[in-house]
C-alpha cells in the first residue's frame, strides 16, 4: 500500500519513510504541497496522506484547501503531522481524518496509518 508523506523537514521525512517502508508500505515523499500534487498526479492514489502544515511554496493549509476541491483527492484520508500544541484542532479545522504530534512515536505512526491502509 502506498503512503504519501509531505514535510519540508528532511529528517522527519526520512524517519517516517524508513518506519513505513520497514513495515512494507510503498512511500512517496514531497517537500511541500505543490510537490505533493505532482506526486498525486503520477500514479495510483495513496491509501493515506501524512501532511505537515508549516512548509514553503504551498503549506499544509493551502494543500488541504485545494485537495478538498477535488472529489477524488478529497476522498484520500489525510493525517495532519505537526508540532503545534493542539494538533487535533488543526485536524478538525482542515477536515482531516486525524492528527499526530511531532516528535513522532513510530508505534503511533504505524497504528494511525494502519487504520486507513487496510
Language model region names:
Residues 3, 9-13, 106:
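Short acidic/polar segment at the start of the alpha1 helix of CheY-like receiver
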Residues 14-22:
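Charged docking surfaces used in two-component/phosphorelay signaling
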Residues 29-48:
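Acidic, metal-coordinating helix/loop segments flanking the phosphotransfer/catalytic sites
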Residues 52:
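Active-site residues of response regulator receiver
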Residues 55:
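Receiver (REC) domain active-site loop signature in two-component systems and cognate sites
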Residues 79-81:
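Hydrophobic/aromatic residues positioned on beta-strands within the core alpha/beta folds
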Residues 104-117:
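C-terminal output helix
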Amino acid at each position: 500500500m502506498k503512503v504519501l508523506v509531505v514535510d519540508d523537514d528532511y529528517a522527519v521525512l526520512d524517519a517516517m519513510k524508513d518506519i513505513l517502508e520497514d513495515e512494507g508500505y510503498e512511500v512517496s515523499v514531497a517537500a511541500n504541497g505543490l510537490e505533493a500534487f505532482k506526486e498525486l498526479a503520477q500514479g495510483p492514489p495513496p491509501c493515506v496522506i501524512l501532511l505537515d502544515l508549516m512548509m514553503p511554496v504551498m503549506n499544509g493549509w493551502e494543500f488541504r484547501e485545494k485537495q478538498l476541491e477535488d472529489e477524488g483527492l478529497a476522498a484520500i484520508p489525510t493525517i495532519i503531522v505537526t508540532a503545534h500544541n493542539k494538533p487535533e484542532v488543526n485536524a478538525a479545522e482542515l477536515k482531516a481524518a486525524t492528527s499526530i504530534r511531532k516528535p513522532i512515536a513510530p508505534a503511533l505512526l504505524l497504528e494511525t496509518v494502519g487504520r486507513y491502509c487496510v
